[in-house]
Amino acid sequence: MPVLHNRISNDELKAKMLAESEPRTTISFYKYFTIASPQQTRDALYQVFTALDVFGRVYLAHEGINAQISVPQSKLETFRQQLYTFDPALDGLRLNIALEDDGKSFWVLRMKVRDRIVADGIDDPTFDASNVGDYLKAADVNAMLDDPDAVFIDMRNHYEYEVGHFENALEIPADTFREQLPKAVEMLREHADKKIVMYCTGGIRCEKASAWMKHNGFNKVWHIEGGIIEYARRAREQGLPVRFIGKNFVFDERMGERISDEVIAHCHQCGAPCDSHTNCKNDGCHLLFIQCPQCASKFNGCCSEQCCEELALPEEEQRRRRAGRENGNKIFNKSRGRLNSKLSIPDPAE
């Protein structure tokens, strides 16, 4: 029986990826469709992807598939053909190609079965996720941005919005997508007669959000086809003005793709213009925050003097302090509340 999971250490896999000479292409895709047996589908797809040396993160559920991966360029067409023939629902699926890509976005393939491909918190049995808003292509997006009757809604997290967004887009202040959905309905009640345009990174969140808005009585709802990634690519190809300002945050080693030259965010430590995210180098913290090169040098890649001091301790002492620590379960926490408490950043919602 073939091995259907990774057995090599992360450090070894990352070193192997960094030593690769063959270029890779970073791709994201999703599809809402019914998967009768997610585990069986996962196991079959895992064998297809490993045979093609695909790295990345793939989630499957009864409601569909969500993937962010990298593929060796020499195997890209074979990958496309095998994906399209794997299931009729995937035939011709749009693949979002990364806008800025050094091919070093992933170093291991992780494929998991989940309850949902996007954690939405929806338990309403009458909700029809297929009743989505209409797609908008790049030219349509620009036209809507000039329409005074249109309202753009950013369905991404606070740390994504902070470094880049469409002109005058509304942020839904929440730490998770499941928190955003009811807040979006509440915030947009006063705009119920407007044209609601929803967007996210690659389309998966705003597609479901558009269906949720329609479920809650909003009739004029659109969402951007392929999200920010597809919009920027098509706008550039068609010679259209790119109306997204700043950087597009991505969930891999790159942590962002430059869309425009503007830097609209600031270093969370000194306030200098900066839009480069990093994780605190103290493994007992690992806070996601924005740090300029000067502060990275001053704090040794840490978010605070406390973390800097802890990082300087012997490794054994660091492990002892991490063991059983109250906030040990906050590793990888990206919440606005934790960011504000550690770095004294004012909450824009207050």
UniProtKB/Swiss-Prot annotation:
Annotated ranges, domain Rhodanese: 146-240
Function: Catalyzes oxygen-dependent 5-hydroxyuridine (ho5U) modification at position 34 in tRNAs.
Active site feature: 200 (cysteine persulfide intermediate)
Protein family membership: Belongs to the TrhO family.
PROSITE patterns according to UniProt: RHODANESE_3 (PS50206)
GO biological processes: tRNA modification
InterPro entries: Rhodanese-like_dom, Rhodanese-like_dom_sf, Rhodanese_C, TrhO, TRHO_N
Biased composition (Basic and acidic residues): 319-328
Oxidoreductase keyword on record: yes
The protein's name in its UniProt record: tRNA uridine(34) hydroxylase
Catalytic activities: uridine(34) in tRNA + AH2 + O2 = 5-hydroxyuridine(34) in tRNA + A + H2O
Database matches in Pfam families: Rhodanese (PF00581), Rhodanese_C (PF12368), UPF0176_N (PF17773)
Annotated region described as Disordered, given as residue ranges: 319-350
EC number: 1.14.-.-
GO function terms (MF aspect): oxidoreductase activity, acting on paired donors, with incorporation or reduction of molecular oxygen
Transmembrane regions listed in the UniProt entry: none
UniProt entry keywords in alphabetical sequence: Oxidoreductase, tRNA processing
UniProt cross-references to SUPFAM superfamilies, sorted A to Z: Rhodanese/Cell cycle control phosphatase
